[in-house]
Amino acid sequence: MRLILTALLFCHSKGRDKRPLFFWGIGAWRISFYNAIKVICLFIICMTTFIAYANIQQPFPFDEIPRELIPENLHTEPQGNSRITQRRQCRRLAHFLLWQLLKTAGTSTALLGQIYRTQSDRPQFPVENIDFNISHSGDWVAVLLHINESEKSAVGIDIEFSKKRNFSALMAHFAPQAEQDWFAKQPDEEQAFYRCWCLREAVLKSQGVGIVKLSSVMHLPKQLQIFSDYCPKGELIFTDELPFYFAAFINQSKIQPHFYHWDRKKLL
């Protein structure tokens, strides 16, 4: 198996409104206060990873997107039962957030109209150095856009809105015994479960591999390492500082992710 994890970004305070995130590297802690440097970083090359999230209950001007950049299945307002409506609205919001991130990154929004699906049904752009990934859970949607100036870009993202589950039983379905033993000792089983689940999902989604391969990803929580045959080497992010649990994989070292949320009128 290939080692893909060189570092992890962790936040595990229960205070959901906190913005600073902590980067856990090998042997040292480094702190990045994103809001303080966001404007400056827009003008330097290392600003390559953009993450935006929003809730479908908040209004967003989907009609401002040029019609030619919208796939046919998103042109009409979602209708049907509540679950179908929720899912379609999440897709519209994801498309809108990706449009916003392309503009924020100074990248051509024409890419939005060129999205195609791979053989594994993963949506992506027709250019190798720019990749994106989308996840939604409940009414929440998150989008990651990554631009790599020197090589092929590969990213994956997973969000999970907290809900009551039999975490131990679920762990037994995909985690080896050693990881289950570690999980049983954690004081916050919910946070520990979503860490194990979301990190795996993010890795697999970067290559369009489904959760059927979840158990093939090896997670060593004490060593902060993940091994997988389905992903290139890179770094992972995990946090519970947002309104949901969040994990992302980026095939780049020393990543500098910048988070935005939609506040009804603009990304903040």
Regions found by a protein language model. Give the residues of each.
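Sequence-pattern detector for short linear motifs
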Residues: L5, R19-F22, F33, V203, ...
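Intrinsically disordered, low-complexity regions enriched for glutamine and histidine
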Residues: A7-F10, D17-K18, R87, K233
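Feature targets compositionally biased, intrinsically disordered low-complexity regions
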Residues: K14-R16, W24-I26, I40, L112, ...
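Ala/Thr-enriched low-complexity intrinsically disordered regions
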Residues: T6-A7, A28, A36
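Positively charged N-terminal leader segments that act as targeting/secretion signals
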Residues: M1-R2, C11-R30
